[in-house]
Amino acid sequence: SDATYRLILERGQEDWDSEYGRFPRLFRDAESIPGLTWPTLTFESEMSVFLGRREVKLIRLGAGHTAGDIVAWVPDAEAMFSGDLVEYRSACYCGDAHLREWPFTLDAIRDFDPKALVPGRGDALAGRATVREAIAMTRDFVNTLYGTAELAVARGRSLKETYAAVREAMDPKFASFAIYEHCLPFNVSRAYDEASGIDHPVIWTAERDREMWGKLQG
């Protein structure tokens, strides 16, 4: 989407540098990587591509995991590829999220009533009931995260105290989810920011990573 292109312009290199700093093992022969991969075609709200006679609609339904998320909807199969807007038995990474808007974007996905959905993480889902379960599960994750952080901020809690409150609320339901432990510090940091009035996610840098860990461990 155009919104994702703007994100690449704004923070693409910083994100690359941050990920390399966190997970150098994933960047084998990093010096051979020529740089960011730039899109050659973008769209504002919706675009159709045709695979033979099959139409695939690329649609920006709203912000959530990032400001620029899209879904791919295959009308004749009633199937959707949701990207990280929907996860299944996996934690959502919310470090660049728009948490208050995300549930409304999930409403829009639900309104398509897909009979199959491929989430960002987790099993491919067959059957409307299972798809609805995944959407509800993602909604619960996002709402529990943000609602707990919002209450903590309203009570004047620190980031470290908010992290503890979020763990208490989320661990019983979500601690078994894939990548939960990895995502939680970044998720709480973003939820804390958004609840504090920082609507646009702050760019992640190595310095910001260190600052976050200092506050959580201090």
Task: Name these PLM-found stretches.
Residues 101-161, 165:
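Divalent-metal (often Zn2+) His-rich catalytic cores of metallo-beta-lactamase-fold enzymes
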